[in-house]
From Swiss-Prot:
It comes from the Bacteria. GO terms for cellular component: cytoplasm. This is Uracil-DNA glycosylase. CDD domains: UDG-F1-like. It comes from Clostridioides difficile (strain 630) (Peptoclostridium difficile). The keyword Translocase does not apply. GO terms for biological process: base-excision repair, AP site formation via deaminated base removal. Gene3D superfamilies: Uracil-DNA glycosylase-like domain. It catalyses: Hydrolyzes single-stranded DNA or mismatched double-stranded DNA and polynucleotides, releasing free uracil. Excises uracil residues from the DNA which can arise as a result of misincorporation of dUMP residues by DNA polymerase or due to deamination of cytosine. Keywords: Cytoplasm, DNA damage, DNA repair, Hydrolase. It is an enzyme of class 3 (hydrolase).
Amino acid sequence: MVNLGNDWDELLKEEFEKDYYLNLRKFLIEEYKTRQIFPNMHNIYEALKHTSYKDTKVLILGQDPYHGDNQAHGLAFSVQPQVKTPPSLLNMYKELKDDLGCFIPNNGYLMPWADQGVLLLNTALTVRAHEANSHKNKGWEIFTDRVISILSEREDPVIFVLWGSNARKKVELIDTSKHYILEAPHPSPLSASKGFFGCKHFSKINEILKKLGKEPINWQIENI
């Protein structure tokens, strides 16, 4: 049984008992037994474990985990310490530098964001090594859609950050009368120059948080 150790346990209890999830679980048990799967089995739910429902101020939506060795650890866009910063995250750092003057750190470990209430959620939480989107349409999207919907049902406003066409489709799950939506092209090198650079989302998030009377996010990731 999944134990997230915070308020998500109660909110997702019914989800973990649904047929689609039980089928997904069976599939994953077999996959982890017979193939190399990322992230490590114990890190699948890292995003939800580190950023509780109550503490979520911002949701940044990713797609599926990094599929290279030693990269993924359960937070969207983040990599383990001592691993080279991937291109999309490097572009996020470049935007942060232009937007807020942050220096570009020597690592891509985003746990400090998660600990401040930034839920770094991928739409699929697992992937086969070196095979992008290999766990697409296995059930994860139903599960992560439910996470988005649960946050949308909350009275306390959440800032939903949707980068790229896949993430932007999720806007239909969100009550836009209560919550804030920031949309832009994906920070990937393929699309960053089409409107991600210059979107100023990081400063916009902090402006909204201040307006809501909440502590802004310290976006600076320190060197390790």
